[in-house]
Design a protein with these regions (language model features):
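Topogenic membrane-insertion module of multi-pass membrane proteins
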Residues: 1-47, 221, 232
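Interhelical loop and helix-boundary elements at the membrane-water interface
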Residues: 1-17, 54-72, 118-138, 182-197, ...
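Multi-pass membrane catalytic core of lipid/isoprenoid biosynthesis enzymes
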Residues: 9-13, 55-119
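Hydrophobic alpha-helical transmembrane segments of polytopic
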Residues: 12-15, 35-42, 106-113, 139, ...
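Helical transmembrane-bundle signal
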Residues: 16, 20-23, 78-81, 114-117, ...
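Helix-coil boundary and interhelical linker segments in multi-pass alpha-helical membrane proteins
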Residues: 22-37, 77-105, 146-165, 212-215
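N-terminal TM1-TM2 helical hairpin plus the immediately adjacent luminal interfacial "cap"
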Residues: 25, 31, 47, 51-54, ...
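C-terminal membrane-associated helical module and adjoining short loops/tails
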Residues: 128-236
Length: 236
């Protein structure tokens, strides 16, 4: 019984890794719909591993390390491959320049900065009730959400048909991952309204964006999340 209690959260973490790995493989093959399902599964399992570990009081150093390693694939490599695929059709042309490398490899910088962000997070003891910088799951939802909406509906076409915008999006993503900006975490210090109204604004605004914009609303929720976090810096 103790074995199950001590390792149930780790099983969810490994499930996250397994799902993320399948997502990466399918995304490379162009099966972005399968990749989308894998991201959803990984997001759910990433939530469950932490929830179960806290509920069973089974937090461990092993679990923390496994969590970061799994997240590196599901929310580091996968969004990096997303931007790799987004830039794939542009060859080595950028503006009026012919680069000595294929432009698509710049997408993998998202994976590099995700790795750096996860390492920083592991060493930072301050991020209990807020994040410093954009967390990797949110970054994945932003980048893949935009890519998926473009593939399905043509939304964000100005970004995905222009390599300058795509490179700018990658640069912004990389900076946000390691920035010192405080970001809201959906963890509650208390049940008092004054302590939680930024979170309530975020939740209600996010629901409205998805209801109004549909698919395009999913990445816009992350943009809204960044804006709300910037507004309420002093409350964190």
């Amino acid at each position: 019984m103790n074995f199950i209690k001590n390792n149930l959260a780790n099983a969810f973490t490994l499930g996250n890794l397994f799902s993320g790995s399948i997502g990466v493989i399918n995304l490379v093959d162009g099966n972005y719909k399968v990749a989308a399902v894998c991201i959803i599964i990984s997001l759910v399992l990433d939530f469950l591993d932490g929830f179960v570990a806290r509920a069973l009081k089974a937090n461990s150093n092993l679990g923390a390390q496994l969590d970061s390693l799994a997240d590196m694939v599901s929310f580091g490599l996968l969004p990096g491959v997303t931007m790799f695929k987004a830039l794939e059709g542009f060859g080595n042309q950028f503006m009026d320049f012919e680069l000595p490398f294929q432009l698509k490899y710049l997408g993998l910088f998202v994976a590099l900065f995700s790795c750096l962000r996860l390492a920083i997070f592991n060493l930072d003891e301050e991020q209990s009730y807020y994040f410093k910088g954009l967390n990797t799951p949110s970054n994945t939802v932003l980048l893949f959400g935009m890519y998926y909406a473009f593939q399905e509906t043509g939304m964000f076409w100005r970004t995905f048909e222009n390599p300058v915008f795509l490179v700018g999006l990658i640069a912004a993503s990389c900076w946000l991952l390691i920035s010192p900006i405080k970001m809201i975490a959906l963890k509650f210090k208390s049940m008092k309204l004054k302590d939680n109204y930024p979170k309530l604004i975020l939740l209600l605004g996010g629901i409205l964006l998805i209801l109004i914009l549909g698919l395009a609303g999913i990445p816009m929720v992350i943009v809204f999340y960044i804006i709300v976090s910037l507004i309420f810096q002093k409350q964190m």
